[in-house]
């Protein structure tokens, strides 16, 4: 279930999802509120699908969201005419659609500088 080196630490909660949003069909929201977690840092695959959906829902539920642009990825998509749109273009457009309204968009380095890790 987890890539080697990315396994959860002991007692770390795991929320297994079956749809694009990490909030649908899981107790993620309940866990976050119970533990008074109000700021989420979102990473993962893929940006135009699960990452975007989870980010939008988190913001709509009142959470503060930071999305790490370089810790997400997109794949080539084709439009209805079969024209391939590059992963870089897909990624940039999705980041722009989330920026400010749903999330603060940062690189991992920018985020780590802010939290002084």
Q: How should each PLM-predicted stretch be described?
A:
Residues 1-117:
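Active-site-adjacent betaalpha module
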């Amino acid at each position: 279930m987890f890539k080697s080196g990315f396994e959860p630490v002991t007692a770390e909660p795991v929320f297994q999802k079956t749809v694009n949003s990490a909030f649908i069909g899981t107790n993620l929201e309940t866990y976050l509120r119970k533990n008074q977690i109000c700021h989420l840092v979102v990473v993962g695959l893929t940006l135009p699908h699960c990452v975007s959906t989870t980010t939008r829902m988190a913001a709509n539920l009142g959470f503060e969201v930071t999305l790490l642009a370089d810790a997400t990825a997109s794949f080539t998509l084709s439009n209805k005419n079969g024209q391939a749109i590059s992963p870089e273009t897909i990624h940039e457009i999705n980041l722009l659609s989330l920026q400010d309204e749903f999330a603060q968009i940062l690189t991992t380095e920018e985020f780590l500088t802010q939290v002084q890790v």
